[in-house]
Regions:
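Active-/binding-site microenvironments in catalytic and ligand-binding cores
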Residues: 1-167
């Protein structure tokens, strides 16, 4: 169920990994760190250095959404082929920060050889892909609610992700 805004469970890449119905719901609800990297170029690689300034926030709020601005290309032919990517080193940095959920406004966090997918999912970090309308979030501090369907033994699920801004 990798269509629209959806969540990947570890089982997507990790044999014997958690399936979508085994993702603890508390990982899907709570304070979130919002990293704005707007206007990323096609094929731009997001490196650990791009994220390091957010270390303290990531330690306090281990859910993270990265805004690249790419979702605005949804109707273009290159949406699925040219999107920005998270490097394996950036994924390792986020795992070291204790992140347990990452969301992006791209169709995938990476491409073959899927270093970011493997790093995240082997450490039980749930991945949300294809987020939209992130420009509507005006605060860098908000509660994320992104619940997957309880689909037994599946590797992914659609989610309805919402940001509840805190005063």
């Amino acid at each position: 169920m990798h269509c629209g805004t959806h969540m990947d469970a570890p089982f997507h890449f990790i044999p014997g990994g958690s399936t979508i119905d085994q993702i603890p719901l508390e990982r899907c609800i709570g304070p979130c760190t919002f990293i704005r990297l707007k206007n990323c170029a096609p094929h731009q690689v997001i490196e650990a250095e791009d994220l390091e300034m957010h270390f303290d926030q990531l330690r306090q709020r281990p859910k993270v959404i990265i805004e690249t601005g790419w979702y605005k290309n949804w109707a273009r032919d290159n949406y699925f082929s040219d999107h920005p990517l998270i490097s394996g080193n950036a994924a390792k940095f986020l795992v070291r920060c204790g992140v347990h959920l990452i969301g992006v406004d791209t169709p995938s966090v990476d491409i073959n050889p899927f270093e970011a997918h493997l790093e995240f999912l082997s450490h039980n970090v749930a991945i949300i892909e294809n987020l939209t309308n992130l420009e509507r979030i005006h605060s860098d501090v908000f509660e994320l609610i992104a619940l997957p369907l309880k689909l037994t033994a599946r590797e992914a699920s659609p989610v309805r992700a919402i940001a509840v801004e805190l005063a």
